[in-house]
Amino acid sequence: MIAGISGRVLKKSGNVLLVETKSGVVFEIVCDVQTSEEVEEGGECFLHTFLSVSQDGITLYGFSNERKKELFLSLTKVSRLGPKTALKIISNEDAETLVTMIASQDVEGLSKLPGISKKTAERIVMELKDEFESAGIKDMRIYHESLEALISLGYPEKQAREAVKHVYREGMKTSELIKEALKFLSQR
């Protein structure tokens, strides 16, 4: 198992990196979009990795932090959801928001991600909700109302989700959550 790789990024092509280690070995690593954007060609990096061996071949997946890797591994445990789909999910939403969506059984939010059908979202929630149970927003009605309010005010959905997740505290009313989220967004 290759748990991590440290080295210099020789080439970036989309979300595929060529990383040369100090010993001269060059690894081809498939990353999520955010990780690929964080590293620079010619720069040094450390990636948490997972080696996938399947009938299609051997693929090395890389992540900028351990949390993303753990989430990726959890997603690959879901029946009929392979590493490519798991990587696509992680590339389209930040790890904390995904954990919150799964823990709070937000099938609607998950099914809005590219390539994720309602059935797949339901399967993800059903198979992983217990694993992430303590991490979610408890009252999804307040979450969705606040999110919709921010979107209707013109904020992009991803920014609105991040703001709501960041300021949420258990027991908040919708109006309080919207107010705090707007404060958070105005400081950015």
From Swiss-Prot:
Keyword Oxidoreductase belongs to the record = no
Q: Which biological process terms from the Gene Ontology are attached to this UniProt entry?
A: DNA recombination; DNA repair
Broad class of where this protein is predominantly found: cytoplasm
Cytoplasm as a keyword? Answer: yes
Q: Which InterPro entries match?
A: DNA_helicase_Holl-junc_RuvA_I (IPR013849), Hlx-hairpin-Hlx_DNA-bd_motif (IPR003583), NA-bd_OB-fold (IPR012340), RuvA (IPR000085), RuvA_2-like (IPR010994), RuvA_C (IPR011114), RuvA_C_sf (IPR036267)
Q: Which GO terms describe its cellular component?
A: cytoplasm; Holliday junction helicase complex; Holliday junction resolvase complex
NCBIfam families recorded: ruvA
Domain topic, free-text comment: Has three domains with a flexible linker between the domains II and III and assumes an 'L' shape. Domain III is highly mobile and contacts RuvB.
By sequence similarity, the record places it as follows: Belongs to the RuvA family.
Name of this chain's protein: Holliday junction branch migration complex subunit RuvA
Gene behind this protein: ruvA
